[in-house]
Amino acid sequence: MSVNDREDSSADLYNGQLLRDIKEVSKALYLTNGPQRPVLSLSPPVRSQSVSRTTEIGLVLSNKKKKSLVPWNWKKPLNAIAHFGQRRFDVCFLLHVHSIEGLPLNLDGTKLVVQWKRKDEVMTTQPSKVLQGTAEFEETLTHRCSVYGSKHGPHRSAKYQVKLFLIYVSPVDAPWLVLGKHWIDLTRILPLSLEEMEGTRSTRKWNTSFKLSGLAESAVLNLSFDYSVVTSSVCDSTSKNVMLRRVGSVPSMDHRSPPLDDGKVVNEVSPSLSLNLSQSIDFLYEKLGEQNPQRSTGTEVELGLETDKQAADSDDSGKGVETFQQERSGLEESNDPNTESSRIEIIDVHEILKDEDESVFEETYFIDQLSVAALKSEPSNLLPKHSVDGTPKSTFSSQVISESSESKSPSAMDDSTEKENFLEVKSSYKAAKISMTSLSLDDITESVANDFLNMLELEECSYVYTSDGEPTSPRESLLREFEKEAFASGNFLLDLNGEAEYVSDIDEKSNDFSFSASSLDVGENKREGKSQLLIDRRKAKVLEDLETETLLRECDFDDNSFDNSLCVCSDGFGSPIELPVDKGLDLLPLGDNIGPSVWTKGGGCIRSMNHLLFRESKEASQLIMQVSVPVVLVSELGSDILEILQIFAASGIEGLCSEVNALIPLEDIMGKTIHEVVDVTKFKRTGQDCSDKSKGVVVQKPPGQLHLCSSNEEFGSSMCPSNVPLEDVTSLAIDEIYILSIEGLKIQCSMSDQDPPSGIAPKPMDQSDALELIRFSLTLDEWLRLDQGMLENKDQDLASNGKGHTLRNKLTLALQVLLRDPSLNNEPIGASMLALIQVERSLDSPNSSLCSLAQEGRNKESFGYDTQLWRITEIGLAGLKIEPGADHPWCTKSQQQSGSRWLLANGTDKTIKCQASESKVIIVSNVQATRKRLDTLWSIISDRHHQEGDLSNSAASVPFTRNLDVIFSNEVTERS
């Protein structure tokens, strides 16, 4: 018979030809030697003359080794054959990564990589270091895959299967930080006709660029895309004769199917279409049962899918993102002279279904969707009834739900058997679904979920007719059930004795939902217990609300009674944190059996930082702060923080570093645990404890250092605005230093969004004079002893009025602070900083203006020295901003990198905008110096003046102000 005659043949003739193909399949199956496997039901592909359209195939797996019937995922074979009728090309996509330009200067020295991702495969370039805002790559990445195309585009143009690729940039030190990602379909660069793809040289280059985001928002990634067709062989399933050859080179017949109506192949075929199986399924089972009944329990089927060693890709319609599926290929040429150019397409079903045991959750979704969609029509039409001779068959249904070794006769099945099989499928699905329910669900959630499943699965149709005759969906029925339970809880409000009868409510529920007798028998006791538990919990909630309302009424309170409660604010990053007046915020302990603070060997202290400062951090990394011994600066250094820094800058970088490390040193604890620091620190057991005694470890303060670490943390987190003794000033100001230190870290790492107003020169003085003034600084204990001696020599009347201490009424305390990460063996995070605290002596009576927290924390007898009170006027933080990427006397290169890494990893690289400095210092601007990168002294001051009444408006105030940068004298001299 010629090709034209076959195309004009009727549907009956087509069915006969299809049966002959199936006979060849069955013969090949019987002659295959190998271990027995579960029976696989396969519907052979029905090919169409259309290039891009095929019909659906269904597969069912019945496995005796499985503990429960798990429905088979029908999407996988559909995705595997979705390319039938299309042309396949082996394409090699090339990605040329040129460079990244326009990177911010703060990323200089950072190593970046460009990653090219296709599903589970990720290709990465070699790391490239950023130099002056540019990262050079000049590297090519290659990805080879199969591309299927058809002539279904406009004007018979080529239409390719989508190939989505993800391109993104990330730092090597922080691979989780993405600096911009872009999705792109590389089939857009393929030609518009399939003939060009088959040409001798099929290639095209596309140059483009992508904008980055995040920290590299202003940067541009320059790329080039290219492709090349690896081979010229094209697999066109519609242009070649298709044959099925059995193993052993037994001659077979070559047939061509007549044209059928085109059906669009999508990733997710509707359940109703998937049930319309091919007629060959029933015939294949019948032949298997007649010719080889002893092997009906399992027959090995070795089939494969024609393709090469590459992956066949398909779109995931659920998320719009493609999923990855590897397919094995097998292509055999026929030895029959009558089939010269014929090819065989083999489907390896075991390879496709090798992960069936791992995809239980995906499979159950199919049966759920299938059942609901089929219920909308007629229950009797759920199972396929195809026949070659006009007789209805349901062998497919029996294979799904039965694990017996017998092959039932299709003619013996009637509608009642189909209905029983359908109910058995749903019952098996329910058992599998309930067995997969997480045991971690609480009773309420489990009760609601079980009631919902029972409703959906025990009804025989998706519509329930109410007494009004109108159909309602299961969702509406579930809503009505919840309304009834809420109404039952409402009746409880009227009957406080709890004697309401809820069993009748369950009976009414069953009547309203028109449940059958079998529905009420399955799980009725369980539903009653869960519903009763749910109602009991609601009763307890209602009782609690009633008791609360009664107490409020007895105390003459209403809902607005607590709106104006007094509170104290302590800022985090951006928004205030309100704390009760009578209770401060407890700091986290530094370790097991250790309080929030410990002394170090050199007399300093390690303190736990307020964890609320890191509540906006992505990784919630908790830092600790190492604080040095405070010193009192001489008044000749200046009365303003900016003036003091100008004299510091006049001493030079090396002189300043050496003097600061000598006066207020910080012990190197890197690589040591907190317990090791505590063990090494051996102080005399006198004075006040630094750690909380209730924690079990007692570390005494060193002699000569007064209350740097407050034992009860009464000042650190409460921010008491009143007057305190001088030795408690550091504890009072520590929270402000916490906030300023985070901003200071950003300034050091060039990640602050605020630039300094300008740069000024240091004080015009000799370097030796500046160093001598710094050396005159006294420790806090020494200054207190000196001040007490001055008081003893003065008249008591003058002392009480404060007139005898004109030169000593204003002081500036300086201490060195350093952030450390306890999770990295106390590694320094950034460079150390100088905290400057300016205080003023209070002229009021000590007993009247003593801070309430100080009175509660210690007895006044323990103050000593007749307890002079002080109040904080200004808190500032200063540091050195040096050339990045180089070791420096102030900090090392690793400290700079660790600070940048921590800011990037925790997402704290953005800050609150600062207001301009209001300092009256004369600005001497040097344009040439400010244009170049110079070593400068930066500083910020807190806008909280710690005076009574200031905290009322603290929420609206800016937390800090950026001062002018002070440029070191030698740097300016060399560049002027």
UniProtKB/Swiss-Prot annotation:
Signal peptide: none
A Pfam family assignment: NT-C2
PROSITE patterns, per database record: C2_NT
Region feature Disordered, mapped onto this chain: 309-343, 381-419
UniProt biased composition (Basic and acidic residues): 309-319
Origin: domain of life: Eukaryota
Regions of compositional bias (Low complexity) in chain numbering: 394-414
Domain C2 NT-type as annotated: residue spans: 81-229
Biological function: Seems not necessary for chloroplast and nuclear photorelocation movements.
Entries under PANTHER family matching the protein: PROTEIN PLASTID MOVEMENT IMPAIRED 1-RELATED 1 (PTHR33414), PROTEIN PLASTID MOVEMENT IMPAIRED 1-RELATED 2 (PTHR33414:SF10)
Name by which UniProt lists this protein: Protein PLASTID MOVEMENT IMPAIRED 1-RELATED 2
Organism: Arabidopsis thaliana
